[in-house]
From Swiss-Prot:
The lineage of its organism: Bacteria, Pseudomonadati, Pseudomonadota, Gammaproteobacteria, Moraxellales. GO terms for molecular function: GTP binding; GTPase activity; guanosine tetraphosphate binding; translation elongation factor activity. PROSITE patterns: G_TR_1 (PS00301), G_TR_2 (PS51722). It is found in: Cytoplasm. Catalyzes the GTP-dependent ribosomal translocation step during translation elongation. During this step, the ribosome changes from the pre-translocational (PRE) to the post-translocational (POST) state as the newly formed A-site-bound peptidyl-tRNA and P-site-bound deacylated tRNA move to the P and E sites, respectively. Catalyzes the coordinated movement of the two tRNA molecules, the mRNA and conformational changes in the ribosome. This is Elongation factor G. Residues 8-290 form the tr-type G domain. Keywords: Cytoplasm, Elongation factor, GTP-binding, Nucleotide-binding, Protein biosynthesis. Belongs to the TRAFAC class translation factor GTPase superfamily. Classic translation factor GTPase family. EF-G/EF-2 subfamily. GO terms for cellular component: cytoplasm. Its main location: cytoplasm. GTP binds at residues 17-24, 88-92, 142-145.
C-alpha cells in the first residue's frame, strides 16, 4: 500500500493546558472544523468526544490522552490536505504523568491558556515538560469572551512566568462580550467569523480605525522577530523595512521549530472564533516528523552504542508504546507512535525491553471514541495495536533484525499510598487482575502487598489519582473496594558519618557461621539522583572478594524496611573497609547478616532522621478569605513562598506544605471560602521532618512492634 499523506504533511501535536482553560472544548472545535464530529459536544453537557471515560464526563476534566486523527486544508482551503494526529492531554496535576508520556511522542504542541486565569501552576508544569522534550509550541489564548479576559496580560505572563518569547500573530478585536474577531498581523486584515455557520465561514475586512495604531506596533514587533531567523532576512529588513508574507511565514516556522519563539493566537472556542486560525498555524508553523531531530536509542551491539532512526518508511521499523488502555469491546489497546519504517497487520515486532517477540493482530486508528481498522502503519503514524500481551508503557517495539531501544520515559515515584480490599472475598482475584491491568497502563501507579499485614497497598501521585483508579476498578472490572486512610511515603536518612563493626557468629559444634565487617556510613543528598552507593576499600583480603556482594545485599535488604520507623532508607554511601573471616565457617549468608547488623547499628549512631514529601501548593482565593486561608496553611506547617494579585480581586498564594498535612484540605478550603477558592498541588521535594512530628511517627512504629 502506498502512503496516502506525504510525511511532510503530517503534524503530531498535543493540545495541552491547565484544568478549565477550555482545552477539551478547543479540541472538540478542532474535530468539528476538520469534519470528524458533526455535532459539537460540550463539556458542560458531559458529551465531549475526547473525554471518553465515564469519570471524565462526570468530572468535566480530561484524564486519559485519547489519540485522534483528523485532516485540515486551511480556513480558506489554501493548503494541501494535512493529517493532524492529536493527543489530548490532561490538565490536572495528579495526571502530570499522562502529559509527560504524551510530550514524549509529540512533534509539536498547542498550549491553551485562559484569557482570565492566565498562566496557572499546571501550565508551568506542562511547560517544563515541553522544555525537557524540546517540543516546539504555539499558544492559544482562549475564553476571550469571558468577563475579565485580558490578552495582553497573558502575553506578559508567558514571558515572566514561563520564560517563553511570545510573538502574537493576531491581536483581539474587543474583549469580553464585545470580542468580535482578530486582526491578522501578517496580512493586516481583520477577521470576523460567521456565528450562523458555527464559525465555518468568515470574512476579511479592514482593520477597525481604533486598532490601527496597536496593530502596526505589534506587526512591527512580529516582523522584527521574523527578521532574526536568517542573516538574509535581517539584511532585507534593514534595507526595505519590510518582509513579504511568505518570508514572514517561513521565518516564523523556522524560529518555532528551533524553540526560539512561541507564536500566539487568541479566540473563544466556545463561541467558535479563532480555533480555525490556530489550525492554520499548526500546519504553517509546527514541524512535520522529519523537521525534528531523528529519535535516539541504544543499539543491540556489545558496546550498547547510541544509534538513531531517521523518519522514513525505508528505515527499519521502530515505535514507542506510550499508552496502554483497556477497551471493553476489543480488550488491550497499545497506543504507539511510529518513528521509522512500516508495520503491517499480522506481522511480528520485537520488544527489546522485555526481550520478546509479539505478533500484531489488528491495527486500529482512533477517532476519539470510534475506531477504523488499518492494514498498515507508517512513519509518523499514531495508532493502537490490539492484543499485545506483554507491553508496558514506555517500551520500544522494533524490527527483530535491526534492534534499537528508544529512550525510556522516566516516571516519578508515588507520594501517597492507600490500603485497598475488595468488599467481598470472592472479588479478591478479580481485584488482583484489575489492579495489575491498571498498573500496566499507568507507570506512576504501583501495587504491592504489605509483608506484615498482608494488605494490598496502592500508591500514586495524589488523592484524586487513586480515587479515580478505585472508581475505574468498579466501573470497568466490576470490583467494589474499601479503601483505608491515606499513608504518606516517608523516607529515612542519616546526617553524620560513622564507622561501625558488624559480627555474625554462630559456632556450636559442627559447621558454624562467621561473618565480620567494618562499614563506614556517610550521608549523601537524599534529593540527588543517586540514593545509595556501595564502595569496597578492603586491603589485604581481610574480607574475601566473593563475600563483598553479600555484604551489599545485606545492607540493601535492611534499607528497604528501614531502621527508625520502617520506611525505606535513602541518601547513604556505605564503604566496606575491613573485617575478618573464617576458612571453614564463613559463607555468603554470614556476611550478608554481618553487613545488615553493621548497617543497622551504624544507622542508629549516625544521627538518623525522617524525611517527608513536601508539596508545592497554589491557592487562588477572593481577597476576603485571604487571612483564613493563610492561617490555615501555617497551621498545616506550610511555608508561604509568595503571593500575587490576579484580576477581579483574587489573590494567589504559593506555599510549600508537607503532604501529611494536606489530607482533607479540599473540604476545609471550600468551607473557609464558601466554595470560592481553588487549589492545586504537586510534589516538590523530600525534606527533613521537625523533631516533634518525627518522634510521634517513630513511637507509633515502636508501639506497633511492641504489640506484635
Amino acid at each position: 500500500m502506498a502512503r496516502k499523506t506525504p510525511l511532510k504533511r503530517y503534524r503530531n501535536i498535543g493540545i495541552s493546558a491547565h484544568i478549565d482553560a477550555g482545552k477539551t472544548t478547543t479540541t472538540e472545535r478542532v474535530l468539528f472544523y476538520t469534519g470528524v464530529s458533526h455535532k459539537i459536544g460540550e463539556v458542560h453537557d458531559g458529551a465531549a468526544t475526547m473525554d471518553w471515560m465515564e469519570q471524565e464526563q462526570e468530572r468535566g476534566i480530561t484524564i486519559t490522552s485519547a489519540a485522534t486523527t483528523c485532516f485540515w486544508s486551511g480556513m480558506a482551503k489554501q493548503f494541501d490536505e494535512h493529517r493532524i494526529n492529536i493527543i489530548d492531554t490532561p490538565g490536572h496535576v495528579d495526571f502530570t504523568i499522562e502529559v509527560e508520556r504524551s510530550m514524549r511522542v509529540l512533534d509539536g504542541a498547542c498550549m491553551v491558556y485562559c484569557a482570565v486565569g492566565g498562566v496557572q501552576p499546571q501550565s508551568e508544569t506542562v511547560w517544563r515538560q515541553a522544555n525537557k522534550y524540546k517540543v516546539p509550541r504555539l499558544a492559544f489564548i482562549n475564553k476571550m469572551d469571558r468577563v475579565g479576559a485580558d490578552f495582553y496580560r497573558v502575553v506578559e505572563q508567558i514571558k515572566t512566568r514561563l520564560g517563553g518569547k511570545p510573538v502574537p500573530l493576531v491581536i483581539p478585536i474587543g474583549k469580553e462580550d464585545d470580542f468580535e474577531g482578530v486582526v491578522d498581523l501578517i496580512t493586516m486584515k481583520a477577521i470576523y467569523w460567521d456565528e450562523a455557520s458555527q464559525g465555518m465561514e468568515y470574512d476579511e475586512r479592514e482593520i477597525p480605525a481604533e486598532l490601527q495604531e496597536k496593530a502596526e506596533e505589534y506587526r512591527e514587533y512580529l516582523v522584527e522577530n521574523a527578521a532574526e531567523a536568517t542573516e538574509e532576512l535581517m539584511n532585507e529588513y534593514l534595507e526595505n523595512g519590510e518582509l513579504t508574507v511568505d518570508q514572514i511565514n517561513s521565518a516564523i516556522r523556522q524560529l518555532t521549530i528551533n524553540n526560539e519563539i512561541i507564536p500566539l493566537l487568541c479566540g473563544t472556542a466556545f463561541k467558535n472564533k479563532g480555533v480555525q486560525k490556530m489550525l492554520d498555524a499548526v500546519i504553517q508553523y509546527l514541524p512535520a516528523p522529519m523537521d525534528v531531530p531523528a529519535i535516539k536509542g541504544i543499539l543491540d551491539d556489545k558496546d550498547e552504542s547510541e544509534g538513531t532512526r531517521e523518519a522514513s518508511d525505508e528505515a527499519p521499523f521502530s515505535a514507542l508504546a506510550f499508552k496502554i488502555m483497556n477497551d471493553k469491546f476489543v480488550g488491550n489497546l497499545t497506543f504507539v507512535r511510529v518513528y521509522s519504517g512500516v508495520l503491517t497487520q499480522g506481522s511480528s515486532v520485537y520488544n527489546p525491553v522485555k526481550m520478546k517477540r509479539e505478533r500484531v493482530g489488528r491495527i486500529v486508528q482512533m477517532m476519539a471514541n470510534s475506531q477504523e481498522e488499518l492494514q498498515e502503519i507508517r512513519t509518523g503514524d499514531i495508532a493502537a495495536l490490539v492484543g499485545m500481551k506483554d507491553v508496558t508503557t514506555g517500551d520500544t517495539l522494533c524490527d527483530e533484525q535491526n534492534v534499537i531501544t528508544l529512550e525510556r520515559m522516566e516516571f516519578p515515584d508515588p507520594v501517597i499510598s492507600l490500603a485497598v480490599e475488595p468488599k467481598t472475598k470472592a472479588d479478591q482475584e478479580k481485584m488482583s487482575i484489575a489492579l495489575g491491568r491498571l498498573a500496566k497502563e499507568d507507570p506512576s501507579f504501583r501495587v504491592h502487598t504489605d509483608e506484615e499485614s498482608g494488605q494490598t497497598i496502592i500508591s500514586g501521585m495524589g488523592e484524586l489519582h487513586l480515587e479515580i483508579l478505585v472508581d475505574r476498578m468498579k466501573r470497568e472490572f466490576g470490583v467494589e473496594a474499601n479503601i483505608g486512610a491515606p499513608q504518606v511515603a516517608y523516607r529515612e536518612t542519616i546526617r553524620n558519618t560513622v564507622e561501625q563493626e558488624g559480627k555474625f557468629v554462630r559456632q556450636t559444634g559442627g559447621r558454624g557461621k562467621f561473618g565480620h565487617v567494618w562499614l563506614r556510613l556517610e550521608p549523601m543528598d537524599p534529593a540527588g539522583d543517586v540514593l545509595y552507593e556501595f564502595k569496597e576499600e578492603v586491603v589485604g583480603g581481610t574480607v574475601p572478594k566473593e563475600f563483598h556482594g553479600a555484604v551489599d545485599k545485606g545492607i540493601q535488604e535492611r534499607m528497604k524496611n528501614g531502621v527508625l520507623a520502617g520506611y525505606p532508607i535513602v541518601g547513604v554511601k556505605a564503604t566496606l573497609y575491613d573485617g575478618s573471616y573464617h576458612d571453614v565457617d564463613s559463607d555468603e549468608l554470614s556476611f550478608k547478616m554481618a553487613g545488615s547488623i553493621a548497617f543497622r547499628k551504624g544507622f542508629m549512631a549516625a544521627n538518623p532522621t525522617l524525611l517527608e514529601p513536601v508539596m508545592k501548593v497554589e491557592v487562588e482565593t477572593p481577597e476576603d478569605y485571604m487571612g483564613d486561608i493563610m492561617g490555615d496553611l501555617s497551621r498545616r506547617r506550610g511555608m508561604v513562598q509568595g503571593m500575587e494579585d490576579l484580576p477581579g480581586g483574587t489573590k494567589q498564594i504559593r506555599a510549600e506544605v508537607p503532604l501529611a498535612e494536606m489530607f482533607g484540605y479540599a473540604t476545609q478550603m471550600r468551607s473557609m471560602s464558601q466554595g470560592r477558592a481553588t487549589y492545586s498541588m504537586e510534589f516538590q521535594k523530600y525534606a527533613e521532618i521537625p523533631k516533634s512530628v518525627a518522634e510521634a511517627i517513630i513511637s507509633k512504629f515502636n508501639n506497633k512492634d511492641d504489640d506484635e
